């Protein structure tokens, strides 16, 4: 497997590590999303310990408004984080 393929698989595995805890095995509820963000992206996403911030992120990601974040919706967060990281790298 290439380095990129390995990282892609890692993103999928991290999602599944949190999505299988409660409810549907392939979606994140608000609590699971908060746990994933605070444990896996603590330096990347600021102010994620306060509930209003988590509520806003969840609301933005839950495109179909079903009360859960699917993998497809989670990829939007990953994409935003990658774009920001890319911009930040060029600032250094």
Swiss-Prot record:
Its main location: secreted. Disulfide bonds: none annotated. Transmembrane segments: none annotated. SUPFAM superfamilies: EF-hand. It is found in: Secreted; Cytoplasm; Cytoplasm, Cytoskeleton; Cell membrane. Residues 13-48, 49-84 form the EF-hand domain. One of its GO terms (biological process) is mast cell degranulation. CDD domains: calgranulins. Keywords: Calcium, Cell membrane, Copper, Cytoplasm, Cytoskeleton, Immunity, Inflammatory response, Innate immunity, Membrane, Metal-binding, Repeat, Secreted, Zinc. Up-regulated in stimulated inflammatory effector cells. InterPro entries: EF-hand-dom_pair, EF_Hand_1_Ca_BS, EF_hand_dom, S100/CaBP7/8-like_CS, S100_Ca-bd_sub. Ca(2+) 1 binds at residues 19, 24, 27, 32. Pfam families: EF-hand_1 (PF00036), S_100 (PF01023). SMART domains: EFh, S_100. Ca(2+) 2 binds at residues 62, 64, 66, 73. The hinge domain contributes significantly to its chemotactic properties. This is Protein S100-A12. The lineage of its organism: Eukaryota, Metazoa, Chordata, Craniata, Vertebrata. The gene is S100A12.
């Amino acid at each position: 497997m290439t380095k990129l393929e390995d990282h892609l698989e890692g993103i999928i595995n991290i999602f599944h590590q949190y999505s299988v805890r409660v409810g549907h095995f392939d979606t994140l509820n608000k609590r699971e999303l908060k746990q994933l963000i605070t444990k896996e992206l603590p330096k990347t996403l600021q102010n994620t310990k306060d509930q209003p911030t988590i509520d806003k992120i969840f609301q933005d990601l839950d495109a179909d408004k079903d009360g859960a974040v699917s993998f497809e919706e989670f990829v939007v967060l990953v994409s935003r984080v990658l774009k920001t990281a890319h911009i930040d790298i060029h600032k250094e």
